Amino acid sequence: GLPCGESCVFIPCITTVVGCSCKNKVCYNN
């Protein structure tokens, strides 16, 4: 998917509210 401009190394993706998920320490949108 497309990168959401957020990392999830130390904290979860806040962008999960818009459909993003954590993959390889970076938040992606499927």
From Swiss-Prot:
Q: Which domain of life is it from?
A: Eukaryota
Question: Pfam families recorded for this chain?
Answer: Cyclotide
Cyclopeptide (Gly-Asn) cross-link site: G1-N30
Example GO BP: defense response
Cite the SUPFAM superfamilies for this sequence: Cyclotides
- PROSITE patterns, per the entry: CYCLOTIDE (PS51052), CYCLOTIDE_BRACELET (PS60008)
Q: What is known of its domains?
A: The presence of a 'disulfide through disulfide knot' structurally defines this protein as a knottin.
Q: What does this protein do?
A: Probably participates in a plant defense mechanism.
Q: What is this protein called?
A: Cyclotide cter-G
Q: Which organism is it from?
A: Clitoria ternatea
